[in-house]
Amino acid sequence: MKLIDLKFKTMGLIAGMCAITLASCSTDDDPVIPEPEPSVLQGSITSDLTLKSGNSYTLNGELLVKEGATLNIEPGVKIVAQYDDRVDYILIEQGAKINAEGTASAPIVMTSSKEEPGAWGGIHICGRAHTNAEGGKGSSEIGGAVYGGDNDADNSGVLKYVRVEYTGYAFDEEHEANGMTFYGVGNGTVVENCEAYHGSDDGFEFFGGSVNVKNMVVVNCSDDSFDWTEGWNGKGENLVAFQESEGTLGYDCDCLIEADNNENNYAATPVSHPVLRNLILVGNGGSKQGIRLRRGTEVEITFAKVCGKAKALAVESAETENALLNGTSKLESVSISGTLDSKEGIYTNELFVGAGNLTEQSFEYASLDDIEKECTWMNGWTK
């Protein structure tokens, strides 16, 4: 196991010395001294590294997992991003992996020494699955790493029972870091039981790819809770977003879901078409949308409750609305507070209700605890 450019405190090594005699000295009984564990993470990983269960590590700057290397993180590990003049984030490049497998009783926590939204830069994973970005390739917003390709079964590792806190670092006026960002990540990657907590950008964002996710929670992220673009077509099951009241947080959060196909080309292929099931999305008022479907995206949503936004469900662009009208996209057993808002007037509130969905509903989700009563899979590891 070798870590290149990884900075850690130097530890002295004490080796036994062999006495010099007329006979040769045997080294059979010399002690084997293990390589010291790094306590500060920084730089580039070029071969496998394991962060041991129960330990705490400091992230000081960028941590880049390079092609061929795997970052293994055991249950109960805590990574604390040092809040200073360095930009802290973890980037998994194409051909690299992260295997972060916590448990409900010992989740992996990635947080900051400054417990405020926007304190550090989150996790960014670049895979070789598709993107409908021009040329079929893209460059990650954070770190500038290449992503995209034609291998939708690409495997970037495992994320289970992982919580990221206080992400959303602003690199400049246009680029803030999400909690977790999936760039062209394939469905060979396992993503389950993950939470984004109190970030100042999106909770989870998908740039293309086919990765499937399950049991995902976003709490109080001031931008969008879930966001997709560039042709994401994975599956999502058990998605929860909760935004505390504006009076409590001091700010109005953005959309619970913001969904695009491609900002520059609404007809770009492969078209965004995730299949989502079992959603509870609770907003904190203001002028933003609950679910915002636009820019050519397609989607299938079954069993969803959406409340707490001025526009619980908004559809925009002819491409997106026509997909709902002709059945390419499906909204089934969706209950919303208020009514559906149609920008183009193609897929209307009447059509939405006629498909068996419910409007003007009232929900009692005053706290995250109220959601946990329905979603017992959240118990024990969410915050």
Residue ranges and their predicted role:
Residues 1-4, 15-42:
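Bacterial Sec-dependent N-terminal signal peptides
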